[in-house]
Amino acid sequence: MHHVQQLINGQFVQSNTDEWIDITDPATQEVIAKVPQTTNDEINQAVAAAQTAFETWRKTPITTRARIFLKYQSLIRDHMDELAEILTAEQGKTIADARGDVFRGLEVVEHAAGIANLQIGDFVENVASGVDTYSIWQPLGVCAGITPFNFPAMIPLWMFPMAIATGNTFILKPSEQDPMVTMRLVELAIEAGVPEGVLNVVHGGKATVDAICDHPDIKAVSFVGSTNVGKHVYERASQSGKRAQCMMGAKNHGVILPDANKEQTLNQLAGAAFGAAGQRCMALSVVVLVGAAGEWIDEIKAKAESLVVSAGKNDKDLGPLISPAAKARVEHLIGTGVEEGASLILDGRGITVEGFEKGNFVGPTIFDNVTSDMQIYQQEIFGPVLCIMRANSLDEAIELLNANPHGNGTAIFTQSGAAAHKFQQDIQVGQIGINLPIPVPLPMFSFSGSRGSKLGDLGPYGKQAVQFYTQTKTVTARWFDDEASRGVNTTISM
């Protein structure tokens, strides 16, 4: 049985813990590896190694740091197929989707390789006679990242490349449910030249999360995951004086106007609602049909019925949920939708895949006539379940969306520029897709979820990522001419 190792001070080592967590193939329930609950002593060793390495790493030339990530992105490309296969085995998403997971992280690594153009301060000459002022963006120190199960390649690559490229050292805690692809990415980072102690990896559940939040030498924590855990991390990390960013739960709505291109809209809706078995924080889990678009129900159902559920080992449309507990939760919420009066027009419960009868499978599920007081609307289901709602006008749809506490993402499908402009201006959501089912985050733009979906004023990606992992130091300088003197100045004037 494979035992997942830790990375401490440049060495891949097995934990001394007595507590090991099973990693299972979600299509078969086979235990494929075990991951440790890292001990407190081992966490302290990792932080100490990062603290020591920081003193050298922060002074390493920025071009040297950039070259490491140039090599790293090349290694990821060379190992793309291997990484996708590992990801599918432990997480369950299809091979094609797994490649996308890795590729979206790769884009952030490429962005980190351009750090010399990103970590640039400001300079103003002659702010006063003979006085110059400049600001520099310096690294914070030891930073940490806590990542979820649903994107075990992309989200770790959101975090440690930008943190390390800006001169910090890093403690990474991958999801205990699927850490193996993350560890393979870490191995490639070490191969690319990341020095000892600059990147460290610890494992486990709540005990490890709390230790990271509490450790006095960790200066910043980045988190992606559920709302409950995100609130816990933000509060606990903030109380110990850390900078924190928490990307949390979502209830993303797509608004369809009657003038939308029907075929393209239906295809994008089905992909965004049911892809990755709905286990995406950017999934479109609610569609609001405006006016005559309410007649599209049969076509929406037909698109969902055309999707093929598989074990993830091929290029079918969606794989299993991550665990039996996740499957049970999704099926329970489907049951509450029926009990509370929604119309179940497509039921994905009870589906089986030949040869994988023990898999955590739930097929595409659609509810019509959903209202805002139902649990299936109020909770993030995190499964392949689409809720259909109706609105008489765009104004009514906007009012419905703005009343929802989440603010991660939304989309509008229309051929009207005026309607799209009104939507993007009036909607209180951080990320908007126009004829796109919420755009995939790109590294040059910030991941800008808002309201109940985000805690912290800076997000991952883009300029905000550089700002999150740095602090500004302002220097005001005057060099005296030895022959010149104005005498004592007791005012605030320069």
What does each model-identified segment do?
Residues 32-38, 52-59, 145, 254-257, ...:
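Short, well-ordered beta-strand elements within core beta-sheets of diverse protein domains
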Residues 28-34, 218, 255, 305-308, ...:
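Conserved C-terminal structural/oligomerization subdomain of aldehyde/semialdehyde dehydrogenase
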Residues 228-371, 434, 483-485, 490-494:
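ALDH superfamily catalytic-core signature
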Residues 29, 65, 87, 109, ...:
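Residue-level signal for inorganic ion chemistry
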Residues 54, 58, 73-80, 84, ...:
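Structural signal for hydrophobic packing residues in well-ordered secondary-structure cores
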Residues 1-27:
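Hydrophobic face of amphipathic alpha-helices that form TPR/SEL1-like repeat modules
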Residues 32-118, 130:
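Glycine-rich loop-to-alpha-helix module at the N-terminal edge of alpha/beta enzyme cores
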Residues 121-267, 315, 391:
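Rossmann-like NAD(P) dinucleotide-binding subdomain of oxidoreductase/dehydrogenase enzymes
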